C-alpha cells in the first residue's frame, strides 16, 4: 500500500509522526509513509489532537472529517480525510 491512497470519499494517508518537533510540517516520505512533524508532546493524546488540527488546516476540512483509523497510540498511523477541500503540494506530489 502506498503512502497516499484515494478512496471514494477522500484520501487515506499512512503517516509516521514525529512529536515534539520544532515546528509543524509535512516533511516528506519516510519509507512507505508520509512523515509529519508536530510540536505537541506524545502525552495524553495531545499529539493526536494536534495532528488532527494541523491536518485540518492543511486540507481545509473540519476536525470531524479527519479520522485516525489505525495507530491511535503509536507513531505509525493511518488517517482518513473525508472530502478534502485542498491538497497540500507535498501530498499532491505523492499521488501522481
UniProtKB/Swiss-Prot annotation:
One Gene Ontology cellular component annotation held by this UniProt entry: cytoplasm
InterPro entries for the chain: DUF167 (IPR003746), YggU-like_sf (IPR036591)
Family annotation (Pfam families): DUF167
Top-level taxon of origin: Bacteria
Xref: Gene3D superfamilies: YggU-like (3.30.1200.10)
Signal peptide: none
HAMAP family per UniProt: UPF0235 (MF_00634)
Family assignment from sequence similarity: Belongs to the UPF0235 family.
Protein name: UPF0235 protein YggU
The species this protein was found in: Salmonella heidelberg (strain SL476)
Highest classification ranks of the organism: Bacteria, Pseudomonadati, Pseudomonadota, Gammaproteobacteria, Enterobacterales
